[in-house]
Each structure stands twice: as C-alpha cells, then as structure tokens.
C-alpha cells in the first residue's frame, strides 16, 4: 500500500518547481561539468571529475525523492476548508500564556514544513496538540524547555 503524503497546493507547486529546476537546469549543467572534467585526462586523480559525479549523484537522488513525493502527494486545497476545528491546513494564531507573545502557524505536510515561514509539520508535537481543538481552547505542549501552554486565539483557512 502506497502511503500518501499530505501537502497543500502551495507545497506541491514548490516541489514541482524544484523538480523542474533540477531536471532542466541543474542536470544539464552537471553533465557539462562532467564532460569538461573528463576532457582533462586521467579520471583516477581528477578531483573536478569526482566532484561533478558526486554532485550528479546528489541531484539524481533528490530528483527521485521529489518524483516519489509528488507521485504520492495528497494535495489538499486549504482555501476550500472551513470550520472552527483545527485540522491539516489550518492557520492558527496562538498566544503563549507565559509571555503573551502571539505566533501564527500553518499546519502543513512534513515535506513543506518550515518554521521560518510559519509552517509546522502535521507530525510535530505542537500540531498534534492543536489538531481537533477549537478557538479559545488552551493547549499544553511539551517543549525542550518544559511544558508550554498556548491559547488558541484564531483559526483561519487561507
């Protein structure tokens, strides 16, 4: 049984763009580097050749990984979701009960999670604590520094 990979339409598009970049730009550039390095003669001691081959291996591995994730993607259009209950795709505004600091997180698939962009994986401890909860509820999450409590201030679908 093939395990589906949940992701937003934005996450799917980002993976598609990376795949196109790697296939149509990076792959030909690397092949060119290999050909150029090969022309320098003895391959056994040709560091440039070995570096280009290693780069090719890395690129081809990532292409295979991207193709696999895209093939197994379960794309969820977040804009068509609604409701007060937090689930995949929700954008949640939290208030730290200790510091009163507001943070906004969107719950996304593992492949598109990026804390710097405010996107957390559905498998993260925070997302798992939020799933199924509603606005106004308080959740407690085990963090590296101990338990943290957050009030759910807002649930949006965007």
Swiss-Prot record:
It comes from Bradyrhizobium sp. (strain BTAi1 / ATCC BAA-1182). InterPro entries: GreA/GreB_C_sf, TF_GreA/GreB_CS, Tscrpt_elong_fac_GreA, Tscrpt_elong_fac_GreA/B, Tscrpt_elong_fac_GreA/B_C, Tscrpt_elong_fac_GreA/B_fam, Tscrpt_elong_fac_GreA/B_N, Tscrpt_elong_fac_GreA/B_N_sf. It comes from the Bacteria. The gene is greA. This is Transcription elongation factor GreA. Belongs to the GreA/GreB family. GO terms for biological process: DNA-templated transcription elongation; regulation of DNA-templated transcription elongation. The keyword Coiled coil applies. Signal peptide: none annotated. HAMAP family: GreA_GreB. Keywords: Coiled coil, DNA-binding, Transcription, Transcription regulation. One of its GO terms (molecular function) is RNA polymerase binding. Residues 47-74 form a coiled coil. Necessary for efficient RNA polymerase transcription elongation past template-encoded arresting sites. The arresting sites in DNA have the property of trapping a certain fraction of elongating RNA polymerases that pass through, resulting in locked ternary complexes. Cleavage of the nascent transcript by cleavage factors such as GreA or GreB allows the resumption of elongation from the new 3'terminus. GreA releases sequences of 2 to 3 nucleotides.
